[in-house]
Amino acid sequence: MSSSNGRGGAGGVGGSSEHPQYPKVVLVTGACRFLGGYLTARLAQNPLINRVIAVDAIAPSKDMLRRMGRAEFVRADIRNPFIAKVIRNGEVDTVVHAAAASYAPRSGGSAALKELNVMGAMQLFAACQKAPSVRRVVLKSTSEVYGSSPHDPVMFTEDSSSRRPFSQGFPKDSLDIEGYVRALGRRRPDIAVTILRLANMIGPAMDTTLSRYLAGPLVPTIFGRDARLQLLHEQDALGALERAAMAGKAGTFNIGADGILMLSQAIRRAGRIPVPVPGFGVWALDSLRRANHYTELNREQFAYLSYGRVMDTTRMRVELGYQPKWTTVEAFDDYFRGRGLTPIIDPHRVRSWEGRAVGLAQRWGSRNPIPWSGLR
């Protein structure tokens, strides 16, 4: 595993960070979720920080509350103007917004999800704008803002955009939220705004759509396609958020592990059985859902499982000064081992079968060549 880099220069989204200072009072939203809760615990253990305030609309579990240590928990919905009072009275100088959810509540669907994410962010950033003590805002965003398509570049840079505009859903909400926090940086140029676009996260403790998708004995795949996966270990996601909160580097940063893993390789490493399904529009999406007995997959996730997504992380290393400890392959292997998943079939045997199949196909092809004019 690689070790952490040195420090880098400042980015360019709102605020100046030529002489960054350590935060004294940090507020973390989404404190009852994995990232928010464990980030709160990390920051509370840092003696350079005087006070950590954890905020969520629901009460944390006893275990999470214990992990938070000296952090103060405030039960508050960030959609409520009360959040402004919490920031003002607490003299908060650094806000880490980690509360955005990628899945809808049990009732309400996408409309409820948009209400939670977008309206909450608007209220929170408005409160930050009015609070003279706030000097730093860190937003946990997502690589999903780039989308996935057959026309994607080899790697997305922070200046790239999706090849297909989003009309709704979590990627659209995430882009809107990024726009609101950039507007905050323009209105308050003394606030350093940091946006972290996290790659798809995976690990032994974090529960995500991708981790559940790969945990089943039968893993549906899109026939004829093999997605390129760039992952991010859950601990590296926490490390990046902590680094951003402490460093105060303004800018937008892609956060992802080194290397890629093809979906077919991931399935083999896990000893799972791939189940190809047809790739014809909505029917393919429905087939994927039925084959996996799983209804959470939406259009964007379907595209990701078809084409994948890879980001350029140069700015993360050079400017933010952060280097993930786990590579993509190491992150996947740690997830698989940590979950205690038992291979359905021996991965070595799968590779042996695959090698034989490729050999047979090559021999058959040499005896039965297909003229190029016949391909369309």
UniProtKB/Swiss-Prot annotation:
GO terms for cellular component: cytosol; extracellular region; plasma membrane. Belongs to the NAD(P)-dependent epimerase/dehydratase family. InterPro entries: Epimerase_deHydtase, Lipid_A_modif_metabolic_enz, NAD(P)-bd_dom_sf. CDD domains: UDP_G4E_3_SDR_e (cd05240). It comes from Mycobacterium tuberculosis (strain ATCC 25618 / H37Rv). Pfam families: Epimerase. This is Uncharacterized protein Rv0501.
